[in-house]
Design a protein with these regions (language model features):
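N-terminal pre-Walker A segment at the start of P-loop NTPase domains
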Residues: 1-19
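Hydrophobic anchor at the beta1->P-loop junction of P-loop NTPases
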Residues: 30-32
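Conserved nucleotide-sensing/catalytic segment adjacent to the nucleotide-binding pocket
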Residues: 63-111
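Post-Walker A helix-loop "phosphate-sensing" segment adjacent to the P-loop in P-loop NTPases
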Residues: 49-61, 75
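Short phosphate-coordinating micro-motif centered on Lys-Gly-acidic
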Residues: 97-138
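Conserved lysine of the Walker
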Residues: 40
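P-loop (Walker A) phosphate-binding loop of NTP-binding proteins
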Residues: 35
Length: 138
């Protein structure tokens, strides 16, 4: 089953981000796919912001971890590790060591990670059509 949404601006992402933020926990993997500039990082920022609001906690988004490869966000209910594998060539990456302690967000997931974790991951694909973002969640 998949859900599809079309948004015309960032503000329209907030309700979607709120719903996603309410459904995540440790031991979960979320794959964010889409071309550069499609809004993957923006959606992640909104999801993290919604978690922060629900916990009444100060939050500072660290941006996309393109060059550091990962950022960790500690919340009361769970922790999130945000990976960005843009331009990463190592297909031998393994997430098992993170799975039990984090909810794992992955931008630009590598093919081997998609194959290995797809059965247990939430996949969010964003495509661009004109000024609209088409979001598919499955």
């Amino acid at each position: 089953m998949s859900l599809r949404f079309a948004v015309s601006n960032e503000i329209e992402l907030k309700p979607l981000a709120r719903n996603i933020s309410r459904s995540i926990s440790n031991n979960q993997i979320i794959l964010f796919e889409g071309e550069a500039g499609s809004g993957k990082t923006t959606l992640i920022r909104y999801i993290l912001s919604e978690i922060s609001k629900s916990e009444k906690k100060t939050f500072s988004f660290q941006g996309s971890p393109t060059y550091q490869r990962e950022h960790i966000y500690n919340f009361n209910k769970f922790n999130i590790i945000h990976f960005d594998f843009y331009q990463v060539q190592n297909n031998k990456l393994d997430l098992d060591e993170y799975f039990y302690d984090y909810c794992i967000f992955i931008e630009w997931p590598l093919e081997n990670l998609i194959k290995r974790y797809n059965h247990m991951a939430l996949s969010i694909s964003i495509s661009v059509t004109g000024k609209k973002r088409n979001i598919e969640i499955k």
